[in-house]
Curated annotation (Swiss-Prot):
ATP binds at residues 240-247. It comes from Caenorhabditis elegans. One of its GO terms (molecular function) is proton-transporting ATPase activity, rotational mechanism. It catalyses: ATP + H2O + 4 H(+)(in) = ADP + phosphate + 5 H(+)(out). Pfam families: ATP-synt_ab, ATP-synt_ab_N, ATP-synt_ab_Xtn, ATP-synt_VA_C. Expressed in proximal but not distal germ cells. Keywords: Acetylation, ATP-binding, Hydrogen ion transport, Ion transport, Nucleotide-binding, Translocase, Transport. Its EC number is 7.1.2.2. Catalytic subunit of the V1 complex of vacuolar(H+)-ATPase (V-ATPase), a multisubunit enzyme composed of a peripheral complex (V1) that hydrolyzes ATP and a membrane integral complex (V0) that translocates protons. V-ATPase is responsible for acidifying and maintaining the pH of intracellular compartments and in some cell types, is targeted to the plasma membrane, where it is responsible for acidifying the extracellular environment. Required along with other vacuolar ATPase components for the removal of protein aggregates which form in immature oocytes in the distal gonad. This is V-type proton ATPase catalytic subunit A. Disruption phenotype: RNAi-mediated knockdown causes larval lethality. Results in increased protein aggregation in the oocytes of sperm-deficient young adult females which is not eliminated by mating. Impaired yolk uptake by the oocytes from the pseudoceolomic cavities. Causes an increase in the section of the excretory canal, which often has multiple lumens and abnormal whorls. Does not affect alae formation in larvae. The gene is vha-13. CDD domains: ATP-synt_V_A-type_alpha_C, ATP-synt_V_A-type_alpha_N, V_A-ATPase_A. Belongs to the ATPase alpha/beta chains family.
Length: 606
């Protein structure tokens, strides 16, 4: 039995917020166990010897006078092999293991299981340069575990550790708790295993933050071409219901060029999480000639809308801590938070129960600060320890403003923090134009950072993108005139702009995520398609403007009649399947089309 002083008593209960007395000596954000069922809670306010606790489980049945056990440690997560491919709830309880233990589809109250299996044995390969008498510091890699084909799990020393090695375990099979290394520092000996415990609210330390300069390619043409994000960037996807936020964040986790994915379903529908669980194991990728499931590089933190509200806040922190752990191994991690609005609503509810002063729309005044402290944990960094390595965490946060109103406090606070804004448009979604990203309001502030990458790999791309945006903007301006006076009264060059903009919108920006050929578009295909479309525009404009004064004028109708086949081929560029056809064939086909267009226009002008 624990000492008497480590117990307090329940004084009042209001939904997920419990007040306890006789809690003198406890700390902010300390983990406590409430009631006879030992529900998990966290102290969020201290006054005298009263503590206010937010409980991460259903509080029905807790009565006045129930014991509150103090644990003396903050809310923490377990880090080690076995994270990938598993499903946790908001406070890192493994849902699969709980289902196996209880044989029930419900999570019982007060259940406590280890996040990582203590029985599973992992093949540990010790680092070559570790030997007794050597010195190590925090963040050093002490060995590797091949967790699966996709993730080579590097075992790191905790950031605070350092000292002289007194014992090294040989390579072999170990559980996560077996001692692998013993250090001595200032006369104290410490043992280290594969398992690390880390408090979720404090960011993991790094050597330095670096400028991000490598694009996060997500296989959606409109995003990769017009509004690119970088590895280590922050992105917001705001949009009303049914605009396709979840589809975009799922396709990001399926096809992006990240090494590991943490997908946090925070207060969204349970069906969306089960969709992820159903789709991901079926999706495969090729690694060294072996086909393996994409689930092997994904960890899910599932916290659906019918789970307790307080755990939503924890789930975001749990997710970002897992992401930082994989970043410290030198991986590029992408974290999807779907959706941060539900998290803000949880903050609002707790804040209301505490009787704090409400600010805009009833959200607490510290909403923007909380959002910033979460988003600022993204970035590309130089990791602690040796050997030197770089890692990154990219955060993609979906925001669902009520009624699709972007002036909502959560959306406006988020836009002040993130660098990339992919605004979804209800009108586009109603026209069945997916991904429904509004190319007039979205923006990316990483254009300058990525210029070097484009110059090196796709030198013509930057000018193509600028031209593409100009065409879309011109089309928007012309559309008002067309609505007033009709198409016929426009100048010929404006007709060309309208028609090419239509091709760009329907065949470049639009993308069917449920087809083999279009669910993922590699960057070379994106650039090739854009090059031909802009090439056609330049040739057509030139032909129209060069012959405007002569007798045999070339009008848009002449071009359309004589080049129907080429225009069809422009639209059909998207049907090339990157997996079946391969890069070389697609590139050659696009070059042949460009040549055919140039010849056709030459013949037309002659």
């Amino acid at each position: 039995m624990a000492a008497e002083s480590s117990y307090g008593f329940v004084y009042g209960v209001s939904g997920p917020v419990v007040t306890a007395e006789k809690m003198a000596g406890s700390a902010m954000y300390e983990l406590v166990r409430v009631g006879h069922q030992e529900l998990v809670g966290e102290i969020i306010r201290l006054e005298g010897d009263y503590a206010t606790i937010q409980v991460y489980e259903e509080t029905s049945g807790v009565t006045i006078g129930d014991p509150v056990l103090r644990t003396g440690k903050p809310l923490s997560v377990e880090l080690g092999p076995g994270i990938m491919g598993s499903i946790f709830d908001g406070i890192q309880r493994p849902l699969k293991d709980i289902a196996d233990i209880t044989q029930s589809i419900y999570i019982p109250k007060g259940v406590s299981t280890n996040a990582l299996s203590r029985e599973a044995r992992w093949d540990f390969v010790v680092s070559k340069d570790l030997r007794v008498g050597g010195h190590v510091t925090g963040g050093d890699i002490i060995g590797t575990v091949d967790e699966n084909l996709l993730i080579k799990h590097k075992i790191l020393l905790p950031p605070s550790a350092c000292g002289t090695i007194t014992f090294v375990a040989p390579s072999g099979q170990y559980t996560v708790e077996d001692t692998l290394l013993e250090l001595e520092f200032a006369g104290r000996k410490q043992k280290f295993s594969m398992l690390q415990i880390w408090p979720v609210r404090s960011p993991r330390p790094v050597t330095e933050k670096l400028a991000a300069n490598n694009p996060l390619l997500c296989g959606q043409r409109v995003l990769d071409a017009l509004f690119p994000c970088v590895q280590g960037g922050t992105t917001a996807i705001p949009g009303a219901f049914g605009c396709g936020k979840t589809v975009i964040s799922q396709s990001l986790s399926k096809y992006s060029n990240s090494d590991a994915i943490i997908y946090v379903g925070c207060g969204e529908r349970g069906n969306e999480m089960s969709e992820v669980l159903r789709d991901f194991p079926e999706l495969t990728m090729e690694v060294e000639g072996v086909t393996t499931s994409i689930m092997k590089r994904t960890a899910l933190v599932a916290n659906t809308s019918n789970m307790p509200v307080a755990a939503r806040e924890a789930s975001i922190y749990t997710g970002i801590t897992l992401a930082e752990y994989f970043r410290d191994m030198g991986l590029n991690v992408a974290m999807m938070a779907d959706s941060t609005s539900r998290w803000a609503e949880a903050l609002r509810e707790i804040s209301g129960r505490l009787g704090e002063m409400p600010a805009d729309s009833g959200y607490p005044a510290y909403l923007a600060a909380r959002l910033a402290s979460f988003y600022e944990r993204a970035g590309r960094v130089k990791c602690l320890g040796s050997p030197e390595r770089e890692g990154s965490v990219t955060i993609v946060g979906a925001v669902s403003p009520p009624g699709g109103d972007f002036a909502d406090p959560v959306t406006s606070a988020t836009l002040g923090i993130v660098q990339v804004f992919w605004g979804l448009d209800k009108k586009l979604a109603q026209r069945k134009h997916f991904p429904s990203i509004n190319w007039l309001i979205s923006y990316s502030e990483y254009m300058r950072a990525l210029e070097e990458f484009y110059e090196k790999n796709y030198p013509e791309f930057v000018s193509l993108r600028t031209k593409c945006k100009e065409i879309l903007q011109e089309e928007e301006d012309l559309s008002e005139i067309v609505q007033l006076v009709g198409k016929a009264s426009l100048a010929e060059s404006d007709k060309v702009t309208l028609e090419v903009a239509k091709i760009i919108k329907d065949d470049f920006l639009q993308q069917n995520g449920y087809t083999k050929y279009d669910r993922f578009c590699p960057f070379y295909k994106t650039v090739g398609m854009l090059k031909n479309m802009i090439g056609f525009y330049d040739l057509a404009r030139h032909a129209v403007e060069a012959t405007a004064q002569s007798d045999n004028k070339i009008t848009w109708n002449v071009i359309k009649d004589s080049m129907g086949d080429l225009i069809y081929q422009l639209s059909a560029m998207k049907f090339k399947d990157p997996v079946a056809d391969g890069e070389a064939k697609i590139r050659k086909d696009y070059e042949d089309l460009a040549e055919a267009m140039a010849n056709a226009f030459r013949n037309l002008e002659d």
